[in-house]
Amino acid sequence: MSVPDRKRALEAAIAYIEKQFGAGSIMSLGKHSSAHEISTIKTGALSLDLALGIGGVPKGRIVEIFGPESSGKTTLATHIVANAQKMGGVAAYIDAEHALDPNYAALIGANINDLMISQPDCGEDALSIAELLARSGAVDVIVIDSVAALVPKSELEGEIGDVHVGLQARMMSQALRKLTATLARTNTCAIFINQIREKIGVSFGNPETTTGGRALKFYSSIRIDIRRIGSIKGGENFDIGNRIKVKVAKNKLAPPFRTAEFDILFNEGISSAGCIIDLAVEKNIIDKKGSWFNYQDRKLGQGREAVREELKRNKELFHELERCIYESVQASQVPAAACVDAESRQVAEAAK
């Protein structure tokens, strides 16, 4: 078949498909603008936003946050909700664990008066509510807390001790098949919080796994593994927070397996000032000599906590350091592009 004939045959096939399934059912990827634009919601931790590679969690996708107990899963999800609201968006929280603290959510920055919350009786109801909210197209982010608490209706109606093999996994697989396309069409972000369990009889490799079967692992565009790695001491040697380490276990939108660390303080959630300090020291924007932190010719303070308080007071300095960090990250990406351009010029010159 000649090239003109193939072109006419393709045009006829496209015309028939659009007639059969509607306009826009098939198109060139380059002309599909939404394929290039990924809108995101910030996580509240600049180090995690940079590790994700796209500046936050993506809208129109499924995100899984998993980790052990008291590792900051709900805190991270609530920060994402708060940031979505600050952008003028609408957020919904499906509290299957019946454990969301409104006072703590408000302390983090969530507008609890505008935050929609549902506490369904069974897993099918929770996932149906999430699908209906996403289908409305009016919700920016939906948090499901947690997958482990999504109890299938038949298990709820049965007796304690009854065996229900694979029931939750089948429920999740069926729901995610419907939910994925709806989220992409309405540009809604769904965040599933998940717990970890240990496989029995595993001698080699990682014995940890997440609940709900394999479907969520496949359908998630981003999987965030969050762990507590230490405590933060305050006055009189009391714990005032936790040091958190996050690993991007899966990422369909940027290189995976990047890590980030940040602080979660009990009285404010994720410490954005702490993230700025860590990144600024790492990028040599802030000079750390002993216990003193210096920025240009200015002494910021002695000790990390003193600098944190200074950045919380001085928002102008906070945003200046944040801008310097972004500029440093962008500058570090330039040499790779420059090398490609130089190589292209060499190839072009050799061809001459």
Curated annotation (Swiss-Prot):
Coiled coil region boundaries: none
Sites where the protein binds ATP: 67-74
A Pfam family: RecA_C
Gene Ontology biological-process entries: DNA recombination; DNA repair; SOS response
GO cellular component: cytosol
CDD domains in alphabetical order: RecA (cd00983)
One GO MF term attached to the UniProt entry: single-stranded DNA binding
Principal cellular location given in the protein's record: cytoplasm
PROSITE patterns referenced in this protein's UniProt entry, alphabetically: RECA_1, RECA_2, RECA_3
Record keywords: ATP-binding, Cytoplasm, DNA damage, DNA recombination, DNA repair, DNA-binding, Nucleotide-binding, SOS response
Compartments, as annotated in UniProt: Cytoplasm
Purpose: Can catalyze the hydrolysis of ATP in the presence of single-stranded DNA, the ATP-dependent uptake of single-stranded DNA by duplex DNA, and the ATP-dependent hybridization of homologous single-stranded DNAs. It interacts with LexA causing its activation and leading to its autocatalytic cleavage.
Family: Belongs to the RecA family.
Protein name: Protein RecA
Gene: recA
